[in-house]
């Protein structure tokens, strides 16, 4: 055997694949509520835990993209913001595609354990709401409607409400290029200028498109999600007491960046 060959475990024995990824803890985190165990409850739990892991990653990436844009042109990190937004888009496409896996569960199979989920609800996903706040859709009223969240989770939401959003960072970036951006009219004018001179304002245009893509993919997820819910439970109320699919449909018109959408009508 070559002296350069080292078998796994012969060096760095303190760290293994399983210990690095905390696999014992991770793989013990799926606890079924159904009794007797419903076959598809494991699938349901796994998918939602994976969503929460991706939400954590998205918060990490979107926060970093925001911070890079807050530094403006002089900060020299706008390329990094572009790169991170591209990663965000890829992850968000995975989130939409993941619904295909959940739809392999039939309504009958879901009903085998659905009643055991109440009053838990996807509405209580703190990270999902953090992501909306960070993206620009801040709504303090959500904190009043949240039930069952911990003080630490409420503190995280309060922090997101007080910190700059991705849109705030985009406006700061516009100002760093000499644009006025204190009113919707000024921002729209800046966007038109960037759109008509993409050579000079290539980074501005690229970041505006990156934000728009983020917005569009969030809309795609909402649309795909509500159709899945209607396929699964029809018009029934949600397990947390919401109106179910009718509430989800009321969220479909949400836009993080209406000025970017409106720009299309002005070109």
From Swiss-Prot:
Catalytic activity as recorded in UniProt: L-tryptophan + O2 = N-formyl-L-kynurenine
List of residues binding heme: 225
SUPFAM superfamilies found in the cross-reference section: Indolic compounds 2,3-dioxygenase-like
Pathway(s) per entry: Amino-acid degradation; L-tryptophan degradation via kynurenine pathway; L-kynurenine from L-tryptophan: step 1/2
Gene Ontology BP annotations: L-tryptophan catabolic process to acetyl-CoA; L-tryptophan catabolic process to kynurenine
Domain of life: Bacteria
Gene3D superfamilies linked: 1.20.58.480
Keywords: Dioxygenase, Heme, Iron, Metal-binding, Oxidoreductase, Tryptophan catabolism
Broad enzyme group: oxidoreductase
Residue numbers binding substrate: 44-48, 114, 239
Cofactor: heme
InterPro entries the UniProt entry points to: Trp/Indoleamine_2_3_dOase-like (IPR037217), Trp_2_3_dOase (IPR004981)
One Gene Ontology MF term: heme binding
Pfam families (alphabetical): Trp_dioxygenase
EC number(s) given by UniProt: 1.13.11.11
Cofactor details (free text): Binds 1 heme group per subunit.
Function: Heme-dependent dioxygenase that catalyzes the oxidative cleavage of the L-tryptophan (L-Trp) pyrrole ring and converts L-tryptophan to N-formyl-L-kynurenine. Catalyzes the oxidative cleavage of the indole moiety.
Family in the record: Belongs to the tryptophan 2,3-dioxygenase family.
Quaternary structure (record): Homotetramer.
Identification of the protein by name: Tryptophan 2,3-dioxygenase
Name of encoding gene: kynA
């Amino acid at each position: 055997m070559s002296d350069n060959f080292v078998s796994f475990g012969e060096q760095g024995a303190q760290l293994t694949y399983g210990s690095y990824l905390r696999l014992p803890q991770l793989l013990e985190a799926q606890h079924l509520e159904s009794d007797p165990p419903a076959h598809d409850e494991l699938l349901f739990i796994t998918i939602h835990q994976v969503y929460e892991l991706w939400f954590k990653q998205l918060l990490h990436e979107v926060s970093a993209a925001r911070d890079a844009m807050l530094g403006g042109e002089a900060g020299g990190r706008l390329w990094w913001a572009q790169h991170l937004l591209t990663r965000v888009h890829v992850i968000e496409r995975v989130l939409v595609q993941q619904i295909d896996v959940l739809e392999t569960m039939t309504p009958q199979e879901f009903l085998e354990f659905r009643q055991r989920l109440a009053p838990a609800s996807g509405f209580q996903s703190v990270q999902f709401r953090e992501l909306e706040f960070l993206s620009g859709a801040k709504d303090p009223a959500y904190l009043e409607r949240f039930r069952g969240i911990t003080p630490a989770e409420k503190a995280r939401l309060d922090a997101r409400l007080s910190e700059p959003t991705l849109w705030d960072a985009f406006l700061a970036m516009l100002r760093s290029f000499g644009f006025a951006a204190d009113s919707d009219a000024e921002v729209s004018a800046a966007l038109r200028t960037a759109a008509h001179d993409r050579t000079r304002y290539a980074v501005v245009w690229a970041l505006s498109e990156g934000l728009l893509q983020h917005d569009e993919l969030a809309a795609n997820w909402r649309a795909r999600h509500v159709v899945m819910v209607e396929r699964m439970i029809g018009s029934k109320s949600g397990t947390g007491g919401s109106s179910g699919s009718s509430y989800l449909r009321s969220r479909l018109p949400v836009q993080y960046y209406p000025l970017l959408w409106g720009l299309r009508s002005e070109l």
